[in-house]
Structures are given as C-alpha cells and as structure tokens.
Amino acid sequence: MTVHDTHTPGRKAPAYKPADWLPTSLKEVRARGWDELDVILFSGDAYIDHPSFGAAVIGRLLEAEGLRVAIVPQPNWKDDLRDFRKLGRPRLFFGVSGGAMDSMVNHYTANKRLRSDDAYTAGGKAGFRPDYVVTVYTRILKQLYPDTPVIIGGIEASLRRTTHYDYWSDSLKPSVLVESGADLLIYGMGDKTMPEIARAMRGGYNLNLLRKLPQVAYLAARKQIETLPENRIMLHSFERCLKDKKAFGENFVRIETESNRMQAATLVEPVGDRFVVVNPPYPSISETDLDRSFALPYTRLPHPRYNGKGDIPAYEMIKFSVNLHRGCFGGCSFCTISAHQGKFVSSRSEESVLDEVRKLTRMPGFKGYISDLGGPSANMYRMGGRNEALCRKCSRPSCIYPSLCRNLNNDHRPLMELYRKVDRLAGVKKSFIGSGIRYDLFGDNNRDYLREVVVNHVSGRLKVA
C-alpha cells in the first residue's frame, strides 16, 4: 500500500507494505517466514496500528522484546471457531482484551437498549463482538487449548478484577478471573507489565514467578495466601457481598483508597474456596519508558484488511490527535481513570511529542490541523506533587477537590510552551485542545493559560472536564 501526503508540496507520506503491520492471518505469518508464534493477541476491536489502541501497543512492545506476535481482531465466536484455530497454539501465551471500551458499554445505552453502531469496527457496524468479550474469548481459548496460558487485560478485565456491580444484569459478579478461567489478569496500563511477563516466560511458563510481578491479579489457594507480603488487606468475600450491601460498599472504599496510594497494599478477596489476589501496581511509568512506548514503529493506520469496508469512527476521531500524558488526579466519582491509569500523572518529553507531530504532518489527509493536544484531562501536563514524600503518605482521591492540594504544582507554563513549539513546526497550521480542561486547576498565576487556549486553540466551543 502506497499513500502520499498532498497537503505539503514535495512532502511524501511513508509507503507501507502489509508486513509493516503485525500479522492477522496465517498468510501474513508465513510471509514473514515464521513457523511458530510466541504470542497471539485477541481483541474485541478492529486492529488499528496506533498508540491509542491497546492491542497495537502491547503487540508492538512484545515485538520490541524480540517476540513473534500476531493479532486476531474481532474473531467470529458464533461459527466453528475457525478464527480461534487459524493461527494455532502460541509458544508462550494467548492475550485477550475486550478493546478500548467495556463491551457492555459498547453494546448498550444507559437504558439497556442495544446500540446500532460500534465506533471501533470498520464501517461503524455493530455485531462484531459478543457481550462480555473477555469472558467469551477466554472460555473458547481454554476449551480449544486447555494447557496454554491465557492472560487477560484491557479496560473490561481491569475494572472487573474483583467483585463488581454489573449494571446490565443488575447483580454482583465475581472477579472476571473466576468467570473466564483466565490464568492471569493485568490491570491498568499494561505497557510495563506485559514485557516483564514476556521476559519471565522466556524459559517456559512459571505461574509462581508471574504471580510475583506487580500489577497482576490471579486466583490462589488458601495455602498460598500465607506466603503473601504482610502489607495486605483482606476484603469481604464475594459470598458475603451478595448478602450484605454494606460489605460490598466497604470493599469498594478499600479498593478505591488503595488505587489512590503511591504505595498500595496487596488486596485479597475470598471467592468460594479460592482467593483473588491483586498485587500492588508498578510505580508511575517513567518519561523514558512512556516515550519509548510512543516511539514504537506504528503505521498509525488501520490494517489493510479493512480497505473498502468503511471508516472506523474511533480512528477517524483521533488520527490527527496527540496524547501528552497519562493519569488524572481529578478524582471524579463517576470516572474509571483512577482504577485504570491511576491518579499520578506521567508526562511525555517535549521531543517525544514534537516527533509524533512531525509524523502526523506526513500522514495522508493531514491538512495542517491537529484535533487535540491533550490527555485524560487536557491541562495536567507535567503536574504533580512538589514533595513526593508527602504524596507517598496521601490517599486523597483528588488533588483538586474539595480544594487544591498545597503540595500540587499546577504550573501551566510548560504546557503553554509545548503548544507554541507544536504550532511552530512546519506543516502545522493550528492545534486544537479537544480534551476537557479542568478549570478548577486555574490559580491567579494561570490566567495566561486560559487566554492562550481561548484565543489560539478552541475549535468552536471550549471543552471542560
């Protein structure tokens, strides 16, 4: 496939071949000369080779570790399961993700009406994934390959790692580990954990070794609980939560509190005769590691298998946007970010951001306008505690509410300087802020930021978070 960027005279977009994407079929695997795969990833989304889509990020990170990786996007679960068989058994493990959204949120409105479209599918068509994707895919893989490890991750698995209220069935459900039969769960952003798992498995599958890694959850027998670190919290059992709403509420508060700590405890939740163990997360990803993740050789395009099948709406929305940071310390009660990305912000370097913008200017169809320079909240770039020792003692869900933390550095000047550097790049006419802005972060010293955004970076209406 060859594409040319016509918006800048003399500037050409990269020419890509099918081999520039991770393989999705046996034909593509054989074209690389591979006779065996190390890891096979299954995703509920279409395969878009872009750093905004989890399967692509994990696949590229594993590829960077020297592993042979393939992705099976949106396999058919209703026929003879040929999509689950076509690539055979991987040498190390299967990885399963529901996609960028929980499959039930993707499928149904708040009134539990079936949606007629799917933003993560070619043509925006619905019906290419089942309800409870992670559980369905994992059960199928365990049925076909009972001896091959299945590792689950992504937003659906992450937010269902312990007992949770399932709005769609109006009931409490146990950990997705119990319902799916998966061997291991990675919660949160997996770009630190997954490569560590791959390294740990180079010498063969050793579940005991994997259970020692941070940011994983697994099912354990009673005798294994006695060997856990002393800094652990025993939650109420799933069975007690079914009988007592107060017990479930207490569990939720404990889990939420630990997710807001810089140094969290191990969580243990009894379910039946086993225990769900949730190890503490890794420290916030470093700038170097975050830059490395964004610098992987993404094509930034949907896989050629979707040519002629219509646009993928989710991709169309973000294809000319740039993510500046990860994490959010807003602490909104309705938001899942603290449970998935955490409240501590990790920012990319200026050069990493500018390098990505340069790549954008060479993409087909780019007309000089960046749709978003943002993140979970638009204006938290390079923000955090001035004194990290104080942050280590803190368990506040929000650094903003009910008032700004006195330890918070809310200086917007680094972000303003980044905006200006982006706008000075050749090929960029204008950059917009499409993410929501937290106006409660403004102080007397940040009025210049609001002026900068309103005058130079608003495409119609200012978006707030």
Residue ranges and their predicted role:
Residues 78-79, 207-260, 273-275, 281-285, ...:
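Terminal amphipathic helices with adjacent charged low-complexity linkers/tails
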Residues 335-352:
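Iron-sulfur (Fe-S) cluster-binding segments and ferredoxin-like electron-carrier domains
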